[in-house]
């Protein structure tokens, strides 16, 4: 049954993409809309010959590929009893190779070290993609970087995107027992939760009232949200052709050139508001599970034992370096 549902979801998703493309071209942008090559290639994604039917991914165009470095290659262990197995999880960082938030240059290397230590401890992969040669803003480069990582790691089942201005603090927590193990995921997913979006003033879209292990397998994006909506500083993407197609759409330049949304997070909110089929593949996790902030209300603020702290917005008060140094001392 789960396999049948997965196949049906792929068919529905392809039809959805065609519908979205038609809607954007005809109704929203009219004659001023200039379709990008990515949109024109959507129909070809599933027409390519595939040696392995379920995991073939179309390679990115060369101008959308960054310099990729595997800082830790997980050891494949088919006897690993966990689901997913540790070597099936890849942590991903992509940036222009510089420090963020006006922090000292050495914080970039400290970030790399933080990810390497965690990946080694749990036998996860860790990939870094330098996107400096891409002619797009870094926040929009995360989508092609994820696809590139999917292609480089065909054994992976999940890619964990984590922003550069975040630290893994509790290195003893494994991703499986904390989030991705099927039973744990069903328990942690937020039910009947409004999906916050800057486009949703006239509509409250809720997450399902319940999940089963089978229904959770249909989710392709696991993310948290704050008061402003879905936050793309820390999220998990299932490696699949369907999600590669979604990422291709999410990163399409037509959306930013035609100012549909100010940034990639807002565009995700646009999809949630206007495309229920996309909303249906998104699972909402409690923010403090994967994306705690240094300050904030109890449902978003960091507490001892949390997996991650994300210094989102630290630049507003020019406190990025102070916070980084303070919490780096708490890594354990």
Swiss-Prot record:
GO molecular function: alpha-1,2-galactosyltransferase activity
Disulfide bond entries: none
Sugar attachment sites: 130
Cell compartments where the protein resides: Golgi apparatus membrane
Membrane topology recorded in Swiss-Prot or TrEMBL: Single-pass type II membrane protein
Record's keyword annotation contains Membrane: yes
Residue intervals on the Cytoplasmic side: 1-10
GO cellular component, one term: Golgi membrane
Keyword Membrane: yes
Segments traversing the membrane: 11-31
Keywords, in A-Z order: Glycoprotein, Glycosyltransferase, Golgi apparatus, Membrane, Signal-anchor, Transferase, Transmembrane, Transmembrane helix
Stretches assigned to the Lumenal side: 32-332
Any Pfam family matching the protein: Glyco_transf_34
Enzyme Commission (EC) number: 2.4.1.-
Superkingdom field: Eukaryota
GO biological process entries: protein N-linked glycosylation; protein N-linked glycosylation via asparagine
Family: Belongs to the glycosyltransferase 34 family.
Function: Involved in the galactosylation of the N-linked core oligosaccharide Man(9)GlcNAc(2).
PANTHER family: ALPHA-1,2-GALACTOSYLTRANSFERASE GMH3-RELATED, ALPHA-1,6-MANNOSYLTRANSFERASE MNN11-RELATED
Protein name per its UniProtKB record: Alpha-1,2-galactosyltransferase gmh3
Organism: Schizosaccharomyces pombe (strain 972 / ATCC 24843) (Fission yeast)
Gene transcribed to yield this protein: gmh3
């Amino acid at each position: 049954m789960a396999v049948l549902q997965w196949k049906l979801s792929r068919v529905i998703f392809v039809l959805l993409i065609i519908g979205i493309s038609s809607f954007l071209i005809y109704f929203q942008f009219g004659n001023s809309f200039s379709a990008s090559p990515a949109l024109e290639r959507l129909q070809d994604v599933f027409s390519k010959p595939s040696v392995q039917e379920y995991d073939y991914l179309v390679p990115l165009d060369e101008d959308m590929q960054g310099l990729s470095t595997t800082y830790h290659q997980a050891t494949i262990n088919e006897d690993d009893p966990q689901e997913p197995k540790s070597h099936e999880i890849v942590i991903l960082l992509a940036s222009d190779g510089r420090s963020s938030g006006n922090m000292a240059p050495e914080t970039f290397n400290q970030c790399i070290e933080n990810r390497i230590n965690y990946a080694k401890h749990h036998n996860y992969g860790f990939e870094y993609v330098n996107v400096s040669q891409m002619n797009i803003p870094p926040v929009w480069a995360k989508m092609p970087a994820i696809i590139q990582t999917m292609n480089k790691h065909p054994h992976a089942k999940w890619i964990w995107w984590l922003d550069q201005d975040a630290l893994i603090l509790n290195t003893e927590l494994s991703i499986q027992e904390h989030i991705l193990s099927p039973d744990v995921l069903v328990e942690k997913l937020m039910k009947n939760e409004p999906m916050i979006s800057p486009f949703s003033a006239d509509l409250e879209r809720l997450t399902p009232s319940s999940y089963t292990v089978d229904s959770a397998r249909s989710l392709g994006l696991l993310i948290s949200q704050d008061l402003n909506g879905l936050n793309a500083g820390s999220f998990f993407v299932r490696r699949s052709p369907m999600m590669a197609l979604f990422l291709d759409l999410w990163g399409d330049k037509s959306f930013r050139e035609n100012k549909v949304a100010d940034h990639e997070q807002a565009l995700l909110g646009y999809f949630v508001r206007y495309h229920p089929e996309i909303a249906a593949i998104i699972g909402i996790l409690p923010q403090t599970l994967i994306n705690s902030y240094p300050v904030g209300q109890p449902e978003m603020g960091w507490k001892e034992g949390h997996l991650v702290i994300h210094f989102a917005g630290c630049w507003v008060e020019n406190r990025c370096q102070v916070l980084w140094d303070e919490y780096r001392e708490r890594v354990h």
